[in-house]
Amino acid sequence: MSNDKRTIYVGGLADEVTERLLNNAFIPFGDIADIQMPADYESQRHRGFAFIEYEQSEDAAAAIDNMNDSELCGRTIRVNLAKPVRVKEDSFKPIWADDDWLQKHAGATLQPEGEPEAEKVETPSTGPAVIEKAEKRNPQVFFDIRIGGNDAGRIVMLLRADVVPKTAENFRQLCTHEQGYGYKGCSFHRVIPEFMCQGGDFTNNNGTGGKSIYGKKFNDENFNLKHNSFGTLSMANSGANTNGSQFFICTTKTDWLDNKHVVFGHVISGAEVVRKMERCGSKSGTPSQKIVIYSCGELK
């Protein structure tokens, strides 16, 4: 794995996190060259951290900006720039096998042996804070989904308030019901396999209704974010500047929608739930089973 500014360290991972889940959570920021999850050879489980190498250093920086201190599988993760030590040219030992390296660069993954508790209090638990920002981090919201009356799981989404603040705030408040209305009880009325799952019409549940927190409709904010991967979260519309409450989750790359629909976030957890929803779809868009958001809100 490369040791330049294209490689990031992801720590604090829950046991159930897999390489595929990491790929789904981090690929919205750019093309990924490699993912490595060092294993504990006794337990055969990963050691609670991973290294992700991007094709471009700018994409790695974007991943750090958006994913550090975010939630993945119920745990807050740390995302920093990986800072490997120099190794001999003839050494095939991976950098993460060196405990000295882990103590310096892997946050609170390891503690030095015999360290007194008083000293531990003084040691930062979050490791090397490569980027410290005072501004508010991008919000995370969730949908708890039922399919055919049965619980299907939770989808967690990161909203890009740093790029499209107005659109992200609309979606956030519709998840929290701060205005007295929103997505709770709303259905996904249109699902097309290998394309997208559309919902958000909480007034008619058929694609003809819904409203934003700003009124019935509001203008397109910008088209800076693209429909570049599975899990992209974008606004549905009936033409330019007709955004309301309806949205869709892409199940594949849909770049023909770029500059026509406003992308405002992406799925960071619950990809398997989106796939369950997708399997209920049809070419016409009519789901074979009712897909309902039975609970929703913001993760703090």
Swiss-Prot record:
UniProt keyword annotations, A-Z: Isomerase, Nucleus, RNA-binding, Rotamase
Record GO terms (molecular function): cyclosporin A binding; mRNA binding; peptidyl-prolyl cis-trans isomerase activity
Subcellular location: Nucleus
Organism in which the protein naturally occurs: Drosophila melanogaster
EC number: 5.2.1.8
One GO term of the biological process aspect: protein folding
Segments forming domain PPIase cyclophilin-type: 142-298
InterPro entries registered for this protein in UniProt: Cyclophilin-like_dom_sf, Cyclophilin-type_PPIase_CS, Cyclophilin-type_PPIase_dom, Nucleotide-bd_a/b_plait_sf, PPIE, PPIE_RRM, RBD_domain_sf, RRM_dom
GO cellular component, one term: catalytic step 2 spliceosome
Protein name: Peptidyl-prolyl cis-trans isomerase E
